[in-house]
């Protein structure tokens, strides 16, 4: 799996990087929360613009971003407009969605920006190009809150995101069985092993899929979302537990690699 480095944070290398969401409504609470999050053991903070009091008004969204960037200090800022179609709070027409993306990009404040695979449609490559011009890396996302598509479909979708120029393909799906969780993990491993051109972010949602949020270093998911007190998706694990488990698994991976090197040297 390849690696991208933003603000000194190497995504796709070592321990999965941790993202926590801001889902407050008022600007004052958004900035308060950002200041609190800036002191936590996390790599990135996601602003869910669709939860904002006035997300449709560029004159309200744009001024908030520079203040948010300052409040977060050196944490990566991921900006996300989660549409109703993808499980979010905001029903937008296509032009409204792309205009809001450009409003965010024009501020030059986002380190990463989420662009939804299906809502972007044929405009996806151009939107990704615009994001890169603005200096933002692209998380290209697809969500299914009802089911888990077959592994081949998940892989096909993430490869299409890569081909469109995305820096971090992301899929989040809902399992109906333990086999569904394995399907997501298998798709993740296939991407890491056979399509390593970019890191990927994957998760199986709900309590049943929680293991997928913790086992990224083993299976190939480069980032994970944690719950700092308010979850933004089903099955997000609390931040303390995420950090504890990621640290433990990272240590085991390091021990395993060292053991392999010792055996090879005999």
Give the ranges of each region predicted by the language model.
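Active-site beta->alpha loop and helix N-cap motifs at the rims of alpha/beta catalytic domains
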Residues: 3, 14-133, 137, 142-150
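Short boundary motifs at domain starts and secondary-structure transition points
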Residues: 7-13, 249-253
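Single conserved hydrophobic/aromatic residue that forms the stacking wall/gate
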Residues: 258, 262-266
């Amino acid at each position: 799996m390849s690696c991208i480095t933003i603000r000194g944070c190497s995504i796709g290398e070592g321990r999965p990087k941790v993202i926590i969401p801001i889902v407050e409504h008022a600007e004052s609470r958004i900035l308060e929360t950002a200041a609190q999050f800036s002191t936590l053991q996390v790599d990135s903070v996601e602003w869910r613009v669709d939860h904002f009091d006035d997300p449709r008004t560029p004159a309200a969204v744009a001024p908030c971003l520079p203040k948010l960037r300052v409040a977060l200090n050196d944490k990566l800022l991921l900006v996300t407009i989660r549409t109703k179609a993808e499980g979010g709070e905001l029903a937008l027409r296509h032009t409204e969605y792309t205009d809001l993306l450009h409003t965010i990009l024009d501020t030059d404040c986002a380190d990463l920006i989420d662009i939804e695979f299906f809502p972007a449609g044929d405009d996806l490559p151009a939107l990704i190009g615009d994001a890169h011009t603005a200096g933002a890396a692209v998380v290209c996302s697809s969500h299914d809150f009802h089911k888990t598509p077959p592994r081949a479909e998940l892989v096909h979708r993430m490869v299409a995101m890569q081909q469109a120029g995305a820096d971090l393909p992301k899929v989040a799906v809902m399992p109906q069985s333990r086999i569904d969780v394995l399907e997501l993990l298998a798709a993740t491993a296939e991407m890491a092993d056979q399509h390593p051109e970019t890191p990927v972010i994957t998760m199986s949602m709900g309590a049943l899929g929680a293991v997928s949020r913790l086992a990224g270093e083993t299976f190939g998911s480069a980032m994970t979302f944690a719950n700092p007190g308010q979850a933004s998706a089903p099955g997000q694990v609390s931040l303390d537990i995420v950090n504890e488990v990621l640290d433990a698994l990272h240590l085991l991976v390091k021990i395993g690699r060292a053991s392999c090197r010792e055996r090879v040297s005999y």
